[in-house]
Design a protein with these regions (language model features):
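N-terminal basic, low-complexity leaders that serve as flexible interaction/assembly modules and, when applicable
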Residues: 1-55, 91, 95, 138, ...
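Generic secondary-structure boundary/loop-capping signal
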Residues: 1-8, 48-50, 70-73, 112, ...
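A contiguous, low-structure linker/loop signature
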Residues: 40-79, 95, 102
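Active-site loop segments of alpha/beta catalytic cores
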Residues: 1, 32, 59, 80-210
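Short C-terminal domain-edge/linker segments immediately following a structured domain
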Residues: 21-24, 65-70, 135-140, 193-195
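Short coil/turn segments at secondary-structure boundaries
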Residues: 9-13, 61-64, 76-87
Length: 210
């Protein structure tokens, strides 16, 4: 950031700054790719959660959930890719693409469980997997469909690879039964939603995938 003269949180909100910071990270050999965005709150914020932009040191994070109960999921906003930080990301990818760099462009996506537990209060969300299983599946389907739209828009903007990070979707948190039922199912749905776009995909889940 200091070398580029571009810092957080400003780079989270401005497509030129986001693009140029990502490019600077590549050119200064911090990464072997050029990837945006720099946080995991874009999707949750677009669906109604409150997010603080953090600081030069700390990433943006959720400070208020859109709803407390999974029963309210039908009231959620759909992802509007024409405004807010979702648009900032898409515009940043277009800027990076226009530079014709000899590096893959990475579009970063937050995984279904992590988005779901950033939109609805996490402990209530996890409890609902057992108490209101059917509604959670309806909610997860909605969340995953919205993420697919965002991923495909990033590809259209110029992303070569989509990286899906789902740190809340671990076996340690959910247990093996719910990991299979809610993580594997909806990660696969997400991958199926972008598989015809002829781009690479990477899934990152903290912990053991079992």
């Amino acid at each position: 950031m200091d070398v580029a003269g571009i810092t957080w949180p400003e780079a989270h909100l401005n497509p030129e700054m986001m693009a140029n910071l990502a490019i600077a990270s590549y050119e200064n050999k911090c990464f072997e790719n050029v990837g945006v965005p720099f946080c995991m709150t874009i999707e949750a914020e677009a669906m109604g959660s409150q997010v603080t932009m953090g600081s030069k040191i700390f990433e943006p994070h959720v400070t208020g959930y859109a709803f407390d109960s999974v029963k309210d999921w039908k009231k959620l906003h759909k992802l509007d890719l024409t405004k807010g930080r979702a648009k900032v990301v898409l515009d940043a990818i277009k800027i990076i693409k226009s530079k014709n760099l000899n590096a893959p462009i990475i579009g970063n996506i937050t995984g279904p469980i992590s988005v779901a537990s950033s939109v609805i209060e996490p402990s209530n969300f996890y409890k609902s997997m057992r108490k209101d299983n059917k509604t959670v599946h309806e909610y997860m389907k909605f969340i995953t469909e919205e993420i697919i739209e965002f991923a495909n828009a990033q590809i259209e903007a110029g992303a070569d690879t989509i990286v899906i990070s789902d740190p809340s979707g671990t076996g340690e948190i959910l247990g093996p039964k719910f990991f299979e039922e809610f993580v594997v199912k909806y990660i696969n749905m997400l991958l199926d939603g972008i598989k015809d776009k002829n781009v690479g995909t990477i899934v990152h889940i903290c912990g053991q995938m079992k």
